[in-house]
Every structure is written in structure tokens, then in C-alpha cells.
Amino acid sequence: MDQGTPHIVLAGGGTAGHVNPLLAVAGAIRDIEPTAQVTVIGTAVGLEKDLVPEAGYELDTIEKVPFPRRPDLYMLRFPAKWKRETAKVRSILETRHADVVAGFGGYASAPVYATAHKMGIPIAIHEQNARAGMANKLGARWADFIGTVYEGTGLKPRAGADVERVGLPLRPAIASLTKRIGDDRAAVRRESAAQLGVDPNRPLVLVTGGSLGAQSLNRAIASSAADLLAHAQIIHLTGRGKISEVRELVTASAGADVLTGIGPESAGQGDYHTAEYLERIDMAFACADLVICRAGAGSVSELAALGLPAIYVPLPIGNGEQRFNAEPVVNAGGGLLVADKDLTPQWVHEHVPDLLADHERLAEFGRKAWEYGIRNAAEIMARHVLQLAEPSK
């Protein structure tokens, strides 16, 4: 073991929402302290199994240990499974000579928090949601530092813990875009527009419901194509398996001639650009004047960091978690919040064209979003993690 090298173990995964911030902080740690040994504990079934090795980090895997939520057979098996996986975590932390553990939520985090606490290893937590998940609620009991994206997450830190709103560590493509648009937003817009086949000199609305799409959002926007196209171009990312219905609704509203795809070959072919998914969504962000989307924590944080006005349509499930994600930036003046049940073609007709025509209001939304957004969250979080590693070097 190199006594002068910080050994940092990051824990979390399952979804991109957990893995992307983890990898952003890992990269920031290496930027600040190139000698740091950074490894990750995750599961063999989450996105981390591919994304972590691809990013150049070693991944140690444990099984998922979700907390039981009802009295059933799993509840009876849970204690033995928890004991087995925490023993595995102890072995990993000993082998990795962990000086500090930083968790990002998800199934892998809870046993890592519990084991690190018993071993006396400092703990840092990052909570990206407005309402914290169960793993981070557990870890908050022992954490030395808690970084959040929102105030009022429901976490209950121990006495003496440091809690700070650090923001969401951004994906590399988005972090790079925040810097580039800060230097010359118009130039970045022109470059991205050429790649997407859109007109850089005409307003653009980006519509996205995520990789799976959002049926209510798709239908309300596509059915309003004629109203919207009078004021702007549209990039509509429909989600997998939903593009045919969107194109049919657009055709019924504005005619088939307005439809085209996304890419340089689409330039001049039509103003309603459709695709199921766009790998380089940062390019669409660079061209957008308004975004209409769900209100996942990642989406809200990225749009705020980029200073993009948005109409947020929270997913109508659970306890309204997505609404809590969007409320702070909307209350700060960075966009609008619309309930899923209220997003109808009539609502779009009555509100969106007027917003697109009111350039000053749209610009003010963008300014307020930029002021609310945090662009250096990965660096802030990384410095706190490295600071916790110092006493154990």
C-alpha cells in the first residue's frame, strides 16, 4: 500500500442517474489528485457493470440487497443476505485499503455505508433527488459529508456532519457544453445546428420524454405541430417505439411535408425533426430556445446548468418526486411546471406559441435558470471526498 496515495472507493449504481454522477466525481478526483486510487463498488446487473470499466475504473461487485418493504418470504431471507453482502464489502474495503467511501445511492450503497461505518472509514454521500432514497437515508446517519442537489431532501445527518447543496455532477458532454456556451453560445449553436440539420437562426423547441418517451407529452406536442411551427422548429425525441404515432399526429396537424429526421442530410427538408433517441443530446441542448420534458433530477439539473428555459411535465407516479425536482428552479424563475393531466393540445395552443413570441420572457427564464444552476458540482464533491481521505493517509 502506498501511504501517500488516497484510496477512494465510490459506491452506487443501477441507473444512469446514479452512475453518471459517480463517474463525474471519479473524473474530478483524478483531475485534482492524479495519484488517487479510485475504485467502484456496484452490482453486476446495473449500468455500472459496463459504464464503470469503460470509463477506466475497476469495479467490485456485490449482489443487490434492497430493503424489504412488506412482510413476505424475502423479508425472512433479508438478514442472511445482508450479512453475506456486508462481509463481502468488508473484504473489498480491506483489499482496496479504503481511506474514504463516497456513495451515490442505489442498491450497492447501503451495505457499503453500514460496513464503512463499522470499520471507522469516513463516509461522503451525494443525494441527487429532492426526496432521498432509502440507501442514502441510512448512510446519512453516519456520513461525515452530505452533498445534495436540493434543499430539504429528508436526510437526517448526524451531529457534526457537513451538509452542502453542491449540485449535480454533470456528464462530461454536458459539463463541456456549459463551458463552451459560456465562451460563445452563438458559435456552439451554429456548429451543433449544422450537425443536426436545423437552422441556427430560427428558434427551436426540443421535446423529449427520455429514452422510453412520454406518451402524453408526445401526443400533446405532436397534435399542436401547426401552432408550434408558426413560431419555431421542433426536435422531437419520441422514445423507443413511439415515433410512428408522433409522425401520424404531426401529419394530421401540419401535413407530411413538415416532417424530417435529424442529421446534416435533413437540412432544408422540413422543420419538424423526429427521432426515437439522440445520442448527442448536448447538440440539441446547444440549439434549443425552449425544452419541453419530464422532470427527472438529471434533466432539471442539466437544463439549469445550461441556462435553458423549460416547461417541466413531471411523471405522474409515486409521491410526486419529479414535481419536487422541478419546483425549485421554477420557483427561481427558470421555467414552467405543468401537471401531466393538464398538458393537452389545448394547453399547448394557449401557452407555448405566446411564450415563443415573448423573447424577453424566454430570455429571463434562461437567465434565472443559469443563476440557479451549478456547473462545478463534480469538483466541489471531489474536493470534499479528498479532504475526508486526508486524515487516513
Curated annotation (Swiss-Prot):
Similarity comment: family membership: Belongs to the glycosyltransferase 28 family. MurG subfamily.
Disulphide-bonded residues: none
Membrane disposition: Peripheral membrane protein
PANTHER family for the chain: GLYCOSYLTRANSFERASE (PTHR21015:SF22), UDP-N-ACETYLGLUCOSAMINE--N-ACETYLMURAMYL-(PENTAPEPTIDE) PYROPHOSPHORYL-UNDECAPRENOL N-ACETYLGLUCOSAMINE TRANSFERASE 1 (PTHR21015)
Organism: Bifidobacterium longum subsp. infantis (strain ATCC 15697 / DSM 20088 / JCM 1222 / NCTC 11817 / S12)
Residues noted as binding UDP-N-acetyl-alpha-D-glucosamine in the record, renumbered to the chain: 15-17, 129, 171, 211, 322
EC primary class: transferase
One Gene Ontology term from the biological process aspect of the record: regulation of cell shape
Name the UniProt record assigns to this protein: UDP-N-acetylglucosamine--N-acetylmuramyl-(pentapeptide) pyrophosphoryl-undecaprenol N-acetylglucosamine transferase
Reactions it catalyzes: di-trans,octa-cis-undecaprenyl diphospho-N-acetyl-alpha-D-muramoyl-L-alanyl-D-glutamyl-meso-2,6-diaminopimeloyl-D-alanyl-D-alanine + UDP-N-acetyl-alpha-D-glucosamine = di-trans,octa-cis-undecaprenyl diphospho-[N-acetyl-alpha-D-glucosaminyl-(1->4)]-N-acetyl-alpha-D-muramoyl-L-alanyl-D-glutamyl-meso-2,6-diaminopimeloyl-D-alanyl-D-alanine + UDP + H(+)
An example Gene Ontology CC term for this record: plasma membrane
Source domain of life: Bacteria
GO molecular function: UDP-N-acetyl-D-glucosamine:N-acetylmuramoyl-L-alanyl-D-glutamyl-meso-2,6-diaminopimelyl-D-alanyl-D-alanine-diphosphoundecaprenol 4-beta-N-acetylglucosaminlytransferase activity; undecaprenyldiphospho-muramoylpentapeptide beta-N-acetylglucosaminyltransferase activity
Cell wall biogenesis/degradation in keyword set: yes
Localization, UniProt: Cell membrane
Chief location of this protein within or outside the cell: membrane
EC number: 2.4.1.227
Pathway involvement of the protein, from the record: Cell wall biogenesis; peptidoglycan biosynthesis
Function: Cell wall formation. Catalyzes the transfer of a GlcNAc subunit on undecaprenyl-pyrophosphoryl-MurNAc-pentapeptide (lipid intermediate I) to form undecaprenyl-pyrophosphoryl-MurNAc-(pentapeptide)GlcNAc (lipid intermediate II).
Keywords annotated in UniProt: Cell cycle, Cell division, Cell membrane, Cell shape, Cell wall biogenesis/degradation, Glycosyltransferase, Membrane, Peptidoglycan synthesis, Transferase
